[in-house]
Amino acid sequence: MSSAEMGKFDISPDEDSSSYSSNSNDFSYPYPTKPAAMKSHYADMDPENQNFLLDSNVGKKKYETQYHPGTTSFGMSVFNLSNAIVGSGILGLSYAMANTGIALFVILLLVVSILSLYSVHLLLKTANEGGSLLYEQLGMKAFGMPGKLAASGSITMQNIGAMSSYLFIVKYELPLVIKTFMNIEENAGHWYLNGDYLVLLVSVILILPLSLLKNLGYLGYTSGFSLLCMVFFLIVVIWKMFQIPCPMESDIINATLINATLAPFADENITISDACKPEYFIFNSQTVYAVPILTFSFVCHPAILPIYEELKSRSRKRMMNVSYVSFFAMFLMYLLAALFGYLTFYGRVESELLHTYSAFLGADILLLIVRLAVLMAVTLTVPVVIFPIRSSVTQLLWAGKEFSWWRHCSITVVLLAFTNVLVIFVPTIRDIFGFIGASAAAMLIFILPSAFYIKLVKKEPMKSVQKIGAALFFLSGILVMTGCMTLIILDWIHTDASDGH
């Protein structure tokens, strides 16, 4: 895309849009909009100086000004939005299915995808009525500084969660790659096989120098490369399902021992076949992580408005069609990845699917290629995620100040150090998916779009079907966030108590 700056904005009303209401104040915050990891589409700009903000034209009932016309085709917009949706969450979907069952997982996946689409609808309509294509600015117009802080904080948390999940992948996968290259069968205690040390090394040697750049020229390439990596990952997951036998050797050994010691009269085949029997409905202590993992996987909302801005022949209906195609494609991709991963390992799936293969296959050339591709993608993407967080902090604390290398470097080092501490001390990637999915993702999908819609869309009364639907959506978001967070914290407490014994 040739330009990231919008001067003024004019949207011709589509079928379901009417008059535009504008607040009485003008806002001109040069606030950058960047999606989360693997979710950015602006390769030729300085992220520190982006400005998607629209200048309000107060006093007119209809929001009419000049605007930068979109130049991105429908197909490329679908590709960009697919980039914004897909991410590391795909690695945790098989784990979610293993703890919900196939049928319950499909129901939850369908519900979350539909609700996410409804959220996109609310967000686009609110942007039209509120006269802004910036998520944080909608919060400012709706609720003042608290609204802006809520939007900015949610996006920052989501980005930190995404960044942590990518470094978790480095922590999990890089030791396995080194073991394969060095032909080491067992972990002999070498420091270079310790994931914590490797995360620190990668962060200091590769990620930090890239993060200190003022402009990331490779931004667009990273986004496309990451999507290709995930498609390749899906193909390998499907292929390996037909190659890995069930029952596995470990299942046969365990079944033999159990029958020999506990039930010598039992039919051994029943125990072995149970390990390869799919479940359709499962409820256990880990089931609570399914909804946060799914919401984490479908968060793309900070990228919706920038993609809408660049869409050729822009209209809300056309952007919703882009969303339908993208969400349907990602729905199929997520479903296939989760299903074939689950049908390969059943109840033995770990919270990061790629790591599960190493426990059963050891050194495998195809998996090694997948690991290298994924590691390269996440390493190049972490600096992309740091940019919007750093810009957000700069705008909140030092708005209007001239660029300072000292401030630029200090914020970068603090962010990267904080994320490394999380990755080293948080036990599993499941906890990152769960906590961020239940908090920031729930805010971005459920709570904020509905709250902005209720506040900014003035032409519809509160008793209208649209406003009632938005209010129910808001309440469901509160319920999802509080319920999942409560159950996750209780699971953490129970796990700590069990470990203490």
Curated annotation (Swiss-Prot):
<feature type="transmembrane region" description="Helical">
    <location>
        <begin position="104"/>
        <end position="124"/>
    </location>
</feature>
<feature type="binding site">
    <location>
        <position position="381"/>
    </location>
    <ligand>
        <name>Na(+)</name>
    </ligand>
</feature>
<dbReference type="GO" id="GO:0005298">
    <property type="term" value="F:proline:sodium symporter activity"/>
</dbReference>
<dbReference type="GO" id="GO:0005886">
    <property type="term" value="C:plasma membrane"/>
</dbReference>
<feature type="transmembrane region" description="Helical">
    <location>
        <begin position="219"/>
        <end position="239"/>
    </location>
</feature>
<feature type="transmembrane region" description="Helical">
    <location>
        <begin position="288"/>
        <end position="308"/>
    </location>
</feature>
<dbReference type="GO" id="GO:0003333">
    <property type="term" value="P:amino acid transmembrane transport"/>
</dbReference>
<keyword id="KW-0406">Ion transport</keyword>
<keyword id="KW-0812">Transmembrane</keyword>
<feature type="topological domain" description="Cytoplasmic">
    <location>
        <begin position="125"/>
        <end position="159"/>
    </location>
</feature>
<protein>
    <recommendedName>
        <fullName>Sodium-coupled neutral amino acid symporter 2</fullName>
    </recommendedName>
</protein>
<dbReference type="GO" id="GO:1903812">
    <property type="term" value="P:L-serine import across plasma membrane"/>
</dbReference>
<feature type="disulfide bond">
    <location>
        <begin position="246"/>
        <end position="276"/>
    </location>
</feature>
<dbReference type="GO" id="GO:0015186">
    <property type="term" value="F:L-glutamine transmembrane transporter activity"/>
</dbReference>
<dbReference type="GO" id="GO:0015804">
    <property type="term" value="P:neutral amino acid transport"/>
</dbReference>
<feature type="transmembrane region" description="Helical">
    <location>
        <begin position="325"/>
        <end position="345"/>
    </location>
</feature>
<feature type="topological domain" description="Cytoplasmic">
    <location>
        <begin position="388"/>
        <end position="408"/>
    </location>
</feature>
<dbReference type="GO" id="GO:0032328">
    <property type="term" value="P:alanine transport"/>
</dbReference>
<feature type="topological domain" description="Extracellular">
    <location>
        <begin position="240"/>
        <end position="287"/>
    </location>
</feature>
<dbReference type="GO" id="GO:1904271">
    <property type="term" value="P:L-proline import across plasma membrane"/>
</dbReference>
<feature type="transmembrane region" description="Helical">
    <location>
        <begin position="468"/>
        <end position="490"/>
    </location>
</feature>
<dbReference type="GO" id="GO:0015824">
    <property type="term" value="P:proline transport"/>
</dbReference>
<feature type="transmembrane region" description="Helical">
    <location>
        <begin position="367"/>
        <end position="387"/>
    </location>
</feature>
<keyword id="KW-1003">Cell membrane</keyword>
<feature type="topological domain" description="Extracellular">
    <location>
        <begin position="346"/>
        <end position="366"/>
    </location>
</feature>
<dbReference type="GO" id="GO:0043090">
    <property type="term" value="P:amino acid import"/>
</dbReference>
<feature type="glycosylation site" description="N-linked (GlcNAc...) asparagine">
    <location>
        <position position="259"/>
    </location>
</feature>
<comment type="function">
    <text>Symporter that cotransports neutral amino acids and sodium ions from the extracellular to the intracellular side of the cell membrane. The transport is pH-sensitive, Li(+)-intolerant, electrogenic, driven by the Na(+) electrochemical gradient and cotransports of neutral amino acids and sodium ions with a stoichiometry of 1:1.</text>
</comment>
<feature type="binding site">
    <location>
        <position position="83"/>
    </location>
    <ligand>
        <name>Na(+)</name>
    </ligand>
</feature>
<comment type="similarity">
    <text>Belongs to the amino acid/polyamine transporter 2 family.</text>
</comment>
<dbReference type="GO" id="GO:1903803">
    <property type="term" value="P:L-glutamine import across plasma membrane"/>
</dbReference>
<dbReference type="GO" id="GO:0006865">
    <property type="term" value="P:amino acid transport"/>
</dbReference>
<dbReference type="GO" id="GO:0015655">
    <property type="term" value="F:alanine:sodium symporter activity"/>
</dbReference>
<feature type="transmembrane region" description="Helical">
    <location>
        <begin position="409"/>
        <end position="429"/>
    </location>
</feature>
<keyword id="KW-1015">Disulfide bond</keyword>
<dbReference type="GO" id="GO:0005283">
    <property type="term" value="F:amino acid:sodium symporter activity"/>
</dbReference>
<keyword id="KW-0915">Sodium</keyword>
<keyword id="KW-1133">Transmembrane helix</keyword>
<keyword id="KW-0029">Amino-acid transport</keyword>
<feature type="topological domain" description="Extracellular">
    <location>
        <begin position="430"/>
        <end position="431"/>
    </location>
</feature>
<dbReference type="GO" id="GO:1903294">
    <property type="term" value="P:regulation of glutamate secretion, neurotransmission"/>
</dbReference>
<feature type="topological domain" description="Cytoplasmic">
    <location>
        <begin position="453"/>
        <end position="467"/>
    </location>
</feature>
